Amino acid sequence: RTVDDVVLTPGNRADLLVTATAGTWAVRAVAVDRGGMGMMHGRLGSAAPGQTKTTLATFAVNGTPTAALDGFSQQFAPRDLRAEAVTAKRELVFGMTMGMGGGRGMGQGTATSGATRDPGMMEFTINGEVFDPDRVDITAGSGSIEEWTLKNTSPMDHPVHLHVWPMQLIETQGQTVQDLQWQDVVNVPANSNVTVRIAFDNFVGKTVYHCHVLDHEDLGMMGVIEVR
C-alpha cells in the first residue's frame, strides 16, 4: 500500500520502500498524542510538550531516475486469515482502575509471583485482572485460528503485543481493514476496539500478551496464554 506516513507504536516495525525524487529530503519522527490523564503528570500520558518532531535521517537524492522496479516474488505473499475458518472468538478488555487491596500483589500473587504495590497506585487490567504469572488466562489449541476483539475502555492508547504469533488486522475503530496487514504490536486507540485474527501455528507452550507501554505492563496489563 502507498502511504505518506507510518504510525509506529512502542515496539512496532515497518518495512518501507521509498520513492524518491531529486533533492534533499528528511525522514522525521512526529510525536503522536496517545491520550492520558492529567493526574499522571506525563509519565503515563502523552508525549512531553515541545517534543513534536525529530529528524531521523536526511537523504540527498541525485542521478538518473530508475524507470521501474522489479516485482516481488510471490513466495513473500503473507497468509490471509479472512478466508479461513475461525475456531474461537474472544474479547479482551484493556482498562484501568485505582488499586484497592492494601499490600496485595499483582493478581493476588505471593511475594515471589507479584510485586507488592501501594494500594493507591493505578492498576492496568485485562478483563478486570492484573497480571499473575501463576494464572493461565487463555488456552488455545495448536493449529487453531482465533479472532480477538481488543477493547480499550481507558483514555489512552494501548499497543498490544502477543509473543510468538503475529496478528492480522481485521477491523479498527469500526472500520474494516481492506488491505492485508500483519503486526506483532497492534495499537488499540483510547476508548476504541480493534479486531485481529491469530493463527496459533508451529509452537506450543506458555507465553504472554501485554501492553507495550512498559509502565502499563508493570502495573498489571499482561496475561498468560497457553497453546497446546
Q: Which positions does each model-derived feature cover?
A:
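Extended terminal and domain-junction accessory segments
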Residues: 1-157, 199-206, 210-228
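C-terminal soluble interaction/assembly domains
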Residues: 166-204, 208, 215-222, 226-228
